[in-house]
């Protein structure tokens, strides 16, 4: 790299400049690719708070909290931002990892890259949480697939005057995370907590406005320690 991420981040217009966001995170991708190639690091977690948009208002309250509203304008804004991130950051990292040759493939072939959101279709709610992956973790995962784990007979949300989204519950995110950890050589005893499998705490009693894991039946909860079908 010939530029500095600090120079990008310190610009007064950085917060609403998606091109600056792209340049900043592509520099981070350079660091990640170099670290993986040198085997100085094997796990990276990218918590991206940049909005990848020129929206000048309160992104949290005026976009993220209103993306499921019937008028649809905020959904278009957040969808465009996600598309920019996918194109400019996720695919950039994947390409850089795939360009580094290793024995029997590339760094990407031996890695798993995951991109997801903190919310599903409705803000603060993990139902219908989309996940995009690249790499097979050295053959542990089949690639080139689209998999839908929703149960279309199990309703998560129904549309109303303040919500345009109809959702369905399905298998639980914790189950996927446990499968990822096992693909990296961990055993369930390394990460499981409580009576259920998968990675992460299961809290059956939650706030009144969100029923949490109560939206899932016992057959789904009991399968959390298994590989996804």
For each of these PLM feature ranges, what is it?
Residues 1-229:
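Ligand-binding pockets and gating/stacking loops
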């Amino acid at each position: 790299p010939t530029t500095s991420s600090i120079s990008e981040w310190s610009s007064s217009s950085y917060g609403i400049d998606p091109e600056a966001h792209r340049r900043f995170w592509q520099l981070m991708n350079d660091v990640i690719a170099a670290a993986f190639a040198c085997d100085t690091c094997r796990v990276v977690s990218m918590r991206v708070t940049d909005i990848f948009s020129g929206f000048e208002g309160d992104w949290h309250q005026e976009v993220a909290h209103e993306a499921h509203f019937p008028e649809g304008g905020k959904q278009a804004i957040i969808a465009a931002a996600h598309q920019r991130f996918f194109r400019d950051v996720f695919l950039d990292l994947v390409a850089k990892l795939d360009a580094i040759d290793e024995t029997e493939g590339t760094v990407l072939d031996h890695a798993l890259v995951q991109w997801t959101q903190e919310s599903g279709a409705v803000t603060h709610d993990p139902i219908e949480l989309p996940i995009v992956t690249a790499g097979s973790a050295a053959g542990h995962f089949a690639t080139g697939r689209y998999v839908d784990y929703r149960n279309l007979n199990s309703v998560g949300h129904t549309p109303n005057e303040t919500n345009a989204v109809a959702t369905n519950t399905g298998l639980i995110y914790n189950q996927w995370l446990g499968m990822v950890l096992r693909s990296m050589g961990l055993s369930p005893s390394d990460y499981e907590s409580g009576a259920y499998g998968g990675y992460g705490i299961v809290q059956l009693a939650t706030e009144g406005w969100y029923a949490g894991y109560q939206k899932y039946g016992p057959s789904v909860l009991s399968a959390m320690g298994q590989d996804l079908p």
